[in-house]
Amino acid sequence: MRAFFTGYCTAFIRQDAPAIAKHFADMVHVTSDDERDVSVQIASAAEWRKIIDRLLDMYRAIDVGSVEAIGLATDALSPRLVQARLRWALTDKASRQLYEFDAMYTLARHTEKFRIIAIAHNELPEYRKCLARIKTEQRSPQ
């Protein structure tokens, strides 16, 4: 699992949407907590690719330079089904911490490779706080 998430993380650092998308199954169940509500959606590969593109746009808006998994725990439910919990840390291109968030993944191996079939995360509130902080800093005189 560590190698899988290292490749996943590297794809995010490179902002390589096709490489990120290759880590996901053809259908993905996504659950997001945005502090106001919990949204649940099922996305096809094409829909998920559009979401990845929007996420990368969000990362560019806050100048993400690095994404690091600072915590990883896994539970193998079977040889073909694994759950993973990760703590992610994002820094900007000047190596300043932006924010951290948690995500839980369910991965399935239908062939020789695992693919993410479900993800639950709490990233959106952390992103919004970070974006607001950056906008405030940009408006404040130095």
For the regions a language model picked out, list residue spans one by one.
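Short beta-strand edge/turn micro-motifs at domain boundaries
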Residues: 98-137
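Hydrophobic/aromatic beta-strand elements that line small-molecule binding cavities or substrate pockets
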Residues: 69-74, 87-90, 102-108
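Hydrophobic pocket/interface hotspot
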Residues: 8, 20-21, 48, 84, ...
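A solvent-exposed, acidic/Ser-Thr-rich amphipathic alpha-helical stretch
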Residues: 18-72, 80
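Short, aromatic-enriched amphipathic alpha-helices that serve as compact interaction elements
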Residues: 1-16, 23
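Generic short beta-strand segments
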Residues: 27-29, 85-91
